[in-house]
Amino acid sequence: MSFTVLIPARLGSSRLPDKPLADIAGLPMVVHVARRALASGAAVVVVAADDTRTVEACARHGVRALLTRRDHATGSDRLAEACDLLALPDSEIVVNVQGDEPLIDPALIDACARLLAERPECVMGTAAHAIDTVAEFENPNVVKVVCDALGRALSFSRAPMPWWRDGYAAGLRQATALSDPPPLRHIGLYAYRAGFLRRYPKLAPSPIETIESLEQLRVLWHGERIAVHVSPLRPGPGVDTPDDLARVRALLHDTGQEPPRESG
C-alpha cells in the first residue's frame, strides 16, 4: 500500500517560538519527526513549512520540504495546499504527522494509513489508546474519543467521556475503577485521502468545533465518518512547551531511551 506523509511545520508557536527548529540531540525537531516518518511504509515524506528557515534546515539534513503560505488557519488547510503543490491524486492516502511529535512510532503511522485504506466509507483515520488513570480522564488537555461498534468515532471532547454515572455516584474515582471498556484518549495522528483534504477547507466550521477547539469535530458535524485505530501502547510525549522539550531531550539524549513501539 502506497501513502504519503505530510508534516505541517509552523514557526509561530506562542508557547515555544521556532518550535520545529528546536535542537534535540543535535538535530532540529522536525528532522526527528521526518526520520520517524521515513521509517514507516510511506512512499513519500514531505515537510510542509511556513518559513524558508525550516525548508533550509530540512534540506541540510536530507529531508524534503516545501514552502506553503503563512496565513493558513489550520494545519489541515496547509496540507491541502501541499497536496496541490505535490499534484497528489485525490485517491492518495495522506497521513498528517504533527511536526512536534519527535517520538512518533512509525508503526502507528502505518496503522492509520492501513486503517483508512480498509475503510472506504470513512474520510479519515486516526488513533487512540486506553486511559488508565482518573487524572488523565478528567484532564481537559486530554482529548477523549467515543467509538461505535464498528470502530468509528461518535464524538471527541475535552470533557470526561463517556461519563461513568454509577461509578462516580458511588464515589469510585480511583484509577482501577474506570469503566470497562476503558475510555479512550485521542492521539493527534490523521490519515485522509487527498481529495477530502482539498474539500475540508471548504466545509463551514461547526459550533461544537469552536466550543471544544477540536478541528476534527467539523468532519463529524458534516456527517462524515472517522475510523479509529486503538493502539495497545501509549505514544511518546509531544512538544508544546519548554518543559515538554526538556523531557524529550532527556529521553533522546541524556538516557538514550525511547517509548516502546507498536508491533507492525
Curated annotation (Swiss-Prot):
Its main location: cytoplasm. It is found in: Cytoplasm. Keywords: Cytoplasm, Lipopolysaccharide biosynthesis, Nucleotidyltransferase, Transferase. GO terms for cellular component: cytosol. GO terms for molecular function: 3-deoxy-manno-octulosonate cytidylyltransferase activity. Pathway: Nucleotide-sugar biosynthesis; CMP-3-deoxy-D-manno-octulosonate biosynthesis; CMP-3-deoxy-D-manno-octulosonate from 3-deoxy-D-manno-octulosonate and CTP: step 1/1; Bacterial outer membrane biogenesis; lipopolysaccharide biosynthesis. One of its GO terms (biological process) is lipopolysaccharide biosynthetic process. It catalyses: 3-deoxy-alpha-D-manno-oct-2-ulosonate + CTP = CMP-3-deoxy-beta-D-manno-octulosonate + diphosphate. Its EC number is 2.7.7.38. The keyword Nucleotidyltransferase applies. It comes from the Bacteria. It is an enzyme of class 2 (transferase). Pfam families: CTP_transf_3 (PF02348). Activates KDO (a required 8-carbon sugar) for incorporation into bacterial lipopolysaccharide in Gram-negative bacteria. Belongs to the KdsB family. This is 3-deoxy-manno-octulosonate cytidylyltransferase.
